Amino acid sequence: INGDWCSIYIAADNVEKIEERGELRAYFCHIECQDECRNLSGGDRIMRNKHCCVGLSFRLDGVCQEFTVVGVKDEKSGVYITDYVGKNYFTVVESTEYITLFSNIIVDEKGTKMNVVLVAAKRDSLTEKEKQKFAQLAEEKGIPTENIRNVIAT
């Protein structure tokens, strides 16, 4: 999982949040895995014990802003927990040499849950098989395939 990654597709059951100016439109930069993947570090390459640090860029009001999202891994469930636009519970669903699939449940301040899935890659496109795998993950999480957005194109 170590290295430079690029967000390719994102999908959510609340599609407005991931549209081009949506607060959850995420652009991955870099991910590092340490300590048997209890520690992930991203973007700005901050290393933190038993945390997941993912470097992300979000476009807010049309301006791209960089963030480091730090998640603490729950050792029992394997889920990373962080705060960004609510409480986030995310997992690395699958990681290969070329792609990494993420699943995230976000609970906002009102208690509303939203499912988000994202695929990041080491290249700027996916194979048809990888696209199908991502669409299948979205469907498994109750996200309609029409809610899939191509992030690399923006």
Question: Model-predicted segments: where are they?
Answer:
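A beta-rich soluble binding module of mature secreted/lumenal proteins
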Residues: I1-T154
